[in-house]
A protein has these predicted regions:
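Conserved small-residue-rich beta-alpha loop and adjacent elements
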Residues: 1-51, 75, 97, 119
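Short alpha-helical
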Residues: 6, 32-35, 62-63, 83-84, ...
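Short amphipathic alpha-helical segments
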Residues: 12-13, 38-39, 69, 88-92, ...
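Generic hydrophobic/aromatic pocket-lining and core-packing "Φ" positions
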Residues: 15-16, 65, 86
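Short beta->alpha connector loops at strand-helix junctions that form conserved
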Residues: 23, 28-30, 58, 80, ...
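Hydrophobic residues in well-ordered beta-strands that form the structural core
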Residues: 27, 33, 58, 102, ...
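A structured beta-alpha segment of the ubiquitous adenosine-cofactor-binding alpha/beta core
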Residues: 55-78
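ALDH superfamily catalytic-core signature
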Residues: 76, 82-168
């Protein structure tokens, strides 16, 4: 079960290992980005993937993801997405004691020490927070700065953040 951001990568990271291990799969792409998964499935079919090895379901999580994660014939559920949905999937999967792999969004800190290359640290913290509009599970959502560097770092970060152009 994959999220809407980076739809081809997220799907590939799930489907590739499943196929490499000799497994079949049922893919449930986020309802906001189903076409990416549809195109990948068409490409897999064109490359000779046998019928039934790869299966795609589309729709909202309540209608598709819940039944998929509850189904007794599904041995494992891999999910990338938010914590609330991850908890629902874990609870559903627990009913049939299936294995789960849950990659849930986190609070990823950037830790900046005084001996760091200052400009590189500011640029990387800025990129970590705003890359892909911050819609990345590994986005730097917190910055921990050594106290002696704090004010200078905040000033530089704010100055550079104010220069970001939106909607180019």
């Amino acid at each position: 079960i994959t999220p809407w951001n980076y739809p081809l990568l997220q799907v590939s990271w799930k489907v590739g290992p499943a196929l490499a291990a000799g497994n079949t799969f049922v893919l449930k792409q986020a309802e906001l980005t189903p076409h990416t998964a549809m195109l990948l499935m068409a490409a897999l079919k064109e490359c000779g993937l046998p019928d039934g090895v790869g299966n795609l379901i589309t729709g909202a999580g309540a209608n598709c993801g819940n039944p998929l994660s509850q189904h007794p014939d599904v041995d494992m559920v891999s999910f990338t997405g938010g914590l609330v949905t991850g908890k629902i999937i874990a609870k559903n999967a627990a009913e049939t004691v299936k294995r789960t792999a849950l990659e849930l969004g986190g609070k990823n800190p950037n830790v900046i020490f005084a001996d760091a290359d200052f400009d590189v640290a500011v640029d990387n913290a800025l990129n970590g927070a705003f890359f892909h509009s911050g819609q990345v599970c590994s986005a730097g959502s917190r910055i921990v700065v050594e106290e002696s560097l704090h004010d200078k770092f905040v000033d530089a970060l704010v100055e550079r953040a104010n220069k970001i152009k939106i909607c180019l």
